[in-house]
Amino acid sequence: MTNIRKTHPLLKIVNHSLIDLPAPSNISAWWNFGSLLGLCLMIQVLTGLFLAMHYTSDTATAFSSVTHICRDVNYGWLIRYLHANGASMFFICLYMHVGRGIYYGSYTYLETWNIGIILLFTVMATAFMGYVLPWGQMSFWGATVITNLLSAIPYIGTTLVEWIWGGFSVDKATLTRFFAFHFILPFIIAALVMIHLLFLHETGSNNPSGIPSDSDKIPFHPYYTIKDLLGFLMLILLLMLLVLFSPDLLGDPDNYTPANPLNTPPHIKPEWYFLFAYAILRSIPNKLGGVLALVMSILILAIIPLLHMSKQRSMMFRPISQVLFWILVADLLTLTWIGGQPVEHPFITIGQVASILYFSIILILMPLASLIENKILKW
């Protein structure tokens, strides 16, 4: 009798995705982040569901409902901080996952890559709207500043912003709709993840060498199931360390002050995972230019496959590109730091230099390095 996992219509899909899937024998720990993102999404959906049972999306009670969750609900503090810090873990894994894709040339799987970019935008939108829900000072002013950016769109900008707000300022209507969107988007993300995996399984995984691995495949289970499990344990350990020892380490103290439209916080800044994009936005003195640069800082990922000039797929054997890649990483860390600093000298200049460098590396220097490396191959 054939095994049920190979014949049952539903189990067959699971089998082909997680058990009998042929995987390259040499994929490193950098390939763990996909499954870690799946774990993060599950943690976020579960903790979010339990938070939604106690949260009220009304301006008068939103802040106190979050306080109520932390004080009166059984393990409410744990659920709340798992959700808040789970978002940070989510973005750490996301950036590592994208970085891996750039380093090892995984972007040549165009469909998978493009769905991934859509996923990145969706997750960022979800995180932004989630940050508004506790209705603290930074929630309110973050929502005001970021939604206001849309007013830079010529002709329809102002109308668009008021349409999103549901009024003439961030208020009751805004909070309610943000809660609705924040609730529905993770399920859309889950659907997109399925499509992402569907496209990935059409081609199979890439591997560190960037060479086709058809001649050397191993079954996903038990080799990569146990490897993923180790990754899960490490992620959960890190998350629990964060939640149980310093849950507010990555948060903003201003968000423990209830939202007040009459009092602007001295430094309006988003959560740490958006700071690099925020720094790019602020480094351009023009509003529309800043918004375009902000969008392009992420959308540039879609252009990366077109700029692939190298004869090799992976950067594993390309030292010049490797150096540029790690300069890019350092540049992003610099932008993250600048995004959290006040708008004054010398931070303005550092931010502008880092922003120019960010686009230069991706658009000019990396393709040039690839061409030089191609030449070196012939020597």
Curated annotation (Swiss-Prot):
One of its GO terms (cellular component) is mitochondrial inner membrane. Keywords: Electron transport, Heme, Iron, Membrane, Metal-binding, Mitochondrion, Mitochondrion inner membrane, Respiratory chain, Transmembrane, Transmembrane helix, Transport, Ubiquinone. A ubiquinone binds at residue 201. Its cofactor is heme b. GO terms for biological process: mitochondrial electron transport, ubiquinol to cytochrome c. Binds 2 heme b groups non-covalently. Heme b b562 binds at residues 83, 182. One of its GO terms (molecular function) is ubiquinol-cytochrome-c reductase activity. It is a multi-pass membrane protein. It is found in: Mitochondrion inner membrane. It comes from the Eukaryota. Heme b b566 binds at residues 97, 196. Pfam families: Cytochrom_B_C, Cytochrome_B. InterPro entries: Cyt_b/b6_C, Cyt_b/b6_C_sf, Cyt_b/b6_N, Cytb/b6-like_sf, Cytochrome_b, Cytochrome_b_C_euk/bac, Cytochrome_b_N_euk/bac, Di-haem_cyt_TM. The chain crosses the membrane at residues 33-53, 77-98, 113-133, 178-198, 226-246, 288-308, 320-340, 347-367. The cytochrome bc1 complex contains 11 subunits: 3 respiratory subunits (MT-CYB, CYC1 and UQCRFS1), 2 core proteins (UQCRC1 and UQCRC2) and 6 low-molecular weight proteins (UQCRH/QCR6, UQCRB/QCR7, UQCRQ/QCR8, UQCR10/QCR9, UQCR11/QCR10 and a cleavage product of UQCRFS1). This cytochrome bc1 complex then forms a dimer. Belongs to the cytochrome b family. Component of the ubiquinol-cytochrome c reductase complex (complex III or cytochrome b-c1 complex) that is part of the mitochondrial respiratory chain. The b-c1 complex mediates electron transfer from ubiquinol to cytochrome c. Contributes to the generation of a proton gradient across the mitochondrial membrane that is then used for ATP synthesis. Heme 1 (or BL or b562) is low-potential and absorbs at about 562 nm, and heme 2 (or BH or b566) is high-potential and absorbs at about 566 nm. This is Cytochrome b. It comes from Lepus tolai. The gene is MT-CYB.
